[in-house]
């Protein structure tokens, strides 16, 4: 089984956006989540113990030659408990912000799948946390230094594979929380003479599941 989250052509409204699923190794595909022709998938995470449980972040985003739209009614956080056959939208009743949302970054703890993080672009960019598998959410950090003022550009998160409280904020620079997102410290960086030619921005992170010091 393969899942692909597609943003589609960012310059046009089109039907190629959304979440797709293949059950035959990629030979055939079925779209299983879609909101509108301006919204695609910004992030997707799977419960490491229960692969039928998925969290998907839809993101309304459209480019123009000199600008872009980030956010709208097509954005949102969705939960499936049956491998994407049906979805429920997570919203205000579960603790998320009111109004239109933008880009959402997700991370689920391998050591405790009940711990899920979501960094959400809204009127005020906020870091949310769920400790019950996505049933309810609370704001864990509202400091703009870490929730950032460019959520359309930096919005990814990563969780230590053995410690649910160690959360990495993939930004500029990379920062790390040791208390489940409440506070962040700059992550020790590679010496400057070893990073020549490497751009300062961070957009993705892989953590070794057997050795979380290796990333």
Where are these regions (language model features)?
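Beta-propeller blade termini and top-face loops
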Residues: 1-215
């Amino acid at each position: 089984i393969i899942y692909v989250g597609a943003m589609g052509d960012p310059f046009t409204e089109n039907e190629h956006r959304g979440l797709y699923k293949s059950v035959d190794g990629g030979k055939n595909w079925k779209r299983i989540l879609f909101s509108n022709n301006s919204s695609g998938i910004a992030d997707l995470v799977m419960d490491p113990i229960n692969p039928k449980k998925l969290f998907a972040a839809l993101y309304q985003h459209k480019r123009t030659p000199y600008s872009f739209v980030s956010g709208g009614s097509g954005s949102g956080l969705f939960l499936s408990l049956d491998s994407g056959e049906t979805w429920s939208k997570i919203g205000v009743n579960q603790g998320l912000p009111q109004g239109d949302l933008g880009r959402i970054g997700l991370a689920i703890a391998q050591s405790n799948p009940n711990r899920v993080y979501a960094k959400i672009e809204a009127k005020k960019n906020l870091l949310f946390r769920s400790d019950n598998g996505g049933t309810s959410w609370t704001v864990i950090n509202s400091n703009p230094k870490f929730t950032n003022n460019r959520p359309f550009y930096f919005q990814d998160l990563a969780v230590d594979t053995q410690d649910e409280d160690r959360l990495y904020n993939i930004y500029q620079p990379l920062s790390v929380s040791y208390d489940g997102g409440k506070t962040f410290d700059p992550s020790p960086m590679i010496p400057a003479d070893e990073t020549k030619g490497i751009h300062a921005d961070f957009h993705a992170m892989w953590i070794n599941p057997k050795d979380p010091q290796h990333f």
